[in-house]
Amino acid sequence: MTQFHIRKISPTVGSEVQGLDLMGDIRADAWRQMCQAFDQTGVLVFRDVDVDVPTQHRLVETLHHGGDLSKLDGINTDGFGYISNKEEEGGAPYGRLLYHIDMHWSEMPFQTPSLYGVEVDPGAAPTTFVNTVHSWKVLPDELKARVKGLSARHESGQQGRGRTTYEAELIQPDWARSHETITPIAMKHPRTGGTMLYVCEQQTREIIGLPKRESDALLDTLFAHIYKPECIIEHHWRTRDLVIWDNMSIQHSRHYVEGGGPVRTLRKIHAPYNELRHYMKNLNDIPTYAEAEPV
């Protein structure tokens, strides 16, 4: 096996972890290095690895809690979901997803999502990632001064604000009711303390207190800054890939997925698992999607 090593994927986002048997005992120093890379780069990529459901839970819960292995106590390590254009119960089965933070509209965006490639055909759509801590660090001073003290409203429902050139490709979730939250645009990360540029093109609707035209123009400026091509990485999926990311500091998007196109079945597990299950049970509203074409 390759010697344990962590390498940066790009200067701004992502690290690849190599030479680690995830199903075995992971040494304390390896956990420490992974947690450090996770906090610094926001995304961990593992290629060509065997990962069962309990192991995936162990990894995401431990990283989410900064290396605290005791947080696994009481977790139902059998639970998982799919993002898939093949599995009958697969979420987001087709279409394009704009850059977003999972559950940005809720009181529970502080999550650690993970996806594992169960079955991936060549040509399956990649997932793209961007680091909004970096976005804030390099935001011009005049824009920092302009947005400090401002808040934005984020909501569930239709993707975006109808301002893309590919509206027909966007998958639109069907919610029973709308959900929303208001947060500062310059937002502190709850674990690392880093400042994030905390708006996303999928779910941020407006900047509070600004006229619509001014709000839209400022959001467009911020999005153009966040999603610069040189700040983005693309992960091209293969079977047995595992990707774990920080849901608040890292935004992710997805290229167009065909319902009848290359199979793309990814096993999805988020931390903190128990708290999220409790929150969604009380919310009693899970989005549905039209069925994808059979593969």
Model-derived features: where do they sit?
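Non-heme Fe(II) oxygenase catalytic core, chiefly the N-lobe of the double-stranded beta-helix
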Residues: T2-L242, M248-V295
